[in-house]
Amino acid sequence: MAKRRPPLDAPAEAASASIRYIESSALLAALLEQDAEAIQDLRALGQRVTSALTFSEAARALIRARVTGRITSNQERQALRALRTFERRIAVVALTSDVLVRAGRPFPVEPIRTLDAVHLATVELLGEPPQLVTIVTRDERVRANARALGYMVS
């Protein structure tokens, strides 16, 4: 289950009113590209939630970016510090067998990659009404499926 910690920069009443599921592509847009819209989406009001998978994906993407010369070692260290800070300020949902079973089933818009299916399964298994959940993503496959499942997308 999730470690339930309201984000440090969100008022308690806003945190209980809506959930913002942060998918790894949005987090990476903020970390690697300093994308202003992604940064704003990450800081928006609401209870922020993500899968434990997000942090492995992000760390691997940062390593890949350094190894391929996209970022320097110093930039990687700074991004990893920002990633760890973000991890302390968000509710993290464990990668459970229920999530993996759901991820292995069909989604409304196929094909979808396995890790994207894990993110969508995590959102579904939160058990919240879709109209109260916004999925923050930059991935078109995740967007299409989120909308088809009734979730808002940012």
Predicted regions and their residues:
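Active-site-proximal, substrate-binding regions of enzyme catalytic domains
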Residues: 34-35, 53-108
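Short loop/helix-cap segments at secondary-structure boundaries that form the rim of catalytic
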Residues: 39-43, 143-151
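Short, well-structured N-terminal submotif of metal-dependent ribonuclease cores
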Residues: 1-57, 65-77
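Short hydrophobic/aromatic-enriched beta-strand-loop microsegments
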Residues: 22, 152-154
